[in-house]
A protein has these predicted regions:
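Active-site entrance/lid segments in N-terminal catalytic domains of soluble metabolic enzymes
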Residues: 1-149
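Glycine-rich phosphate-binding active-site loops on the catalytic face of alpha/beta enzymes
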Residues: 3, 19-28, 122-132, 161, ...
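Residues on a specific face of well-ordered alpha-helices
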Residues: 11, 139-143, 147, 166-167, ...
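C-terminal helical cap(s) of enzyme catalytic domains, especially alpha/beta-barrels
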Residues: 33-37, 185-199
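Catalytic cores of alpha/beta
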Residues: 106-115, 148, 154, 159-176
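Short, proline-centered helix/strand-breaking motifs
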Residues: 151-152, 205
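Residue-level detector of conserved catalytic or cofactor/ligand-binding positions
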Residues: 198-206
């Protein structure tokens, strides 16, 4: 949800009873992230989290600064993605922050559990942006995750409505994670033409 998961989106989701997520790398710097977190707090008194995607790069973002900003801002949930977040776990856990790691396979989910993550977001091949290396759809992936994991997990990828939630719960998840579906909302800073296309081509948006 890069460039879409801003304060408006996160606050709306939290106010509706979900857990809204600000995309940390969208902000780019610790100072801008601190400002976005402050804006979100003005729009909701409910809990919300921040996503940090750890990517290999010759010129990486200021990850230490971003992590410190999250801690100093009092955010209590971080969704990590990309590289193994083990390096950051002691600092986050010491601050009392719950860590949800985004995984595209059962083996990565088990690894996240082993390093102390509180929960995982299990992303099937249906997800937008980063379906992983194995191309496993949720109908196969979620039941296997339920068999292997002791920590809670939410289902991600192709989730859009109440039917998605019922299916996720039936396959062992504790809930579901929606992303692409929210691009069509008024809170998304996306051109209306793109929103309309996502509604017309309702089965293809995550391709």
């Amino acid at each position: 949800m890069h460039y879409v998961g801003l304060a408006e989106m996160a606050a709306a989701v939290s106010n509706a009873g979900g857990l809204g997520i600000i995309t940390g790398l969208t902000q780019g710097t610790p100072e801008k992230l601190a400002n976005e977190i402050a804006r979100c707090k003005e729009m909701t008194g409910k809990p919300f989290g921040v996503n940090l995607t750890f990517l290999p790069s010759l010129t990486p973002p200021d990850y230490p600064g971003l992590v410190n900003t999250i801690i100093q801002s009092g955010v209590k949930v971080v969704e990590t993605a990309g590289n193994n977040p083990a390096k950051w776990m002691p600092q986050l856990k010491e601050a009392g922050i719950k860590v949800i790691h985004k995984c595209t396979s059962v083996r990565h989910s088990v690894k996240a559990q082993d390093i102390g993550c509180d929960a995982v977001s299990v992303d099937g091949f249906e997800c937008g942006g980063h379906p992983g290396e194995d191309d496993i759809p949720n109908f196969i992936l979620l039941p296997r995750a339920a068999d292997e994991l002791e920590i809670p997990f939410v289902a991600s990828g192709g989730m859009a409505d109440a039917r998605s939630l019922v299916a996720s719960l039936a396959m062992g998840a504790e809930g579901m994670n929606m992303g692409t579906r929210f691009i069509a909302t008024k809170e998304a800073p996306v051109h209306d033409n793109v929103k309309q296309l996502s509604l017309i081509h309702i089965s293809e948006p995550t391709r």
